[in-house]
Amino acid sequence: MDVWFYRFIRPIIKAFFYIVFRPTVKYKENVPKKGRIIIASNHTDYFDCVALVATNKRTIHFLAKDELLKGVLGPGFKAMGIIPVNRREKDKNALPAALKVLEEDKVIGIFPEGTFKKDIDGLLPFKIGAVKMAHDSKSRIIPVAVVGKFRPFRKGITIVYGKPYKIESD
């Protein structure tokens, strides 16, 4: 999957993110420079994806609701390697597409909560997809915590990269 647009847009995203949100980033060295990994982050806002792209040198192929690829930004999302997920019915295409990316020793980005709700503090229940993907592809999972609120021109957002781990048993 060629993601030429990702290489073009990442510096713009990074500059925007660091200027506007002034994040604190911890332990980004936990992301290996190569090899298949799944970045699994909590989901607090649409800017979570921007945060991960801006604070990470690897190209991340996010799983995202298919509605995002239908709007005006859809062509850009497609060019960045977004994998669409049909959440209205059991999606039979997203997991094989993600596994193919991992077979190429690339990076999948997933939000195990599946969505976010602005009116809820804390985590929503996790879905099993990230663990199943890690098990089936023998990939490592890197947990990421996005802590705080995305408030323009104020400090307050922290991105913490956890240590990679592997799912060892069935």
What are these regions (language model features)?
Residues 1-22:
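N-terminal membrane-anchoring alpha-helices
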Residues 52, 76, 100, 132-134:
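Hydrophobic/aromatic ligand-binding patch that stacks against planar heteroaromatic rings
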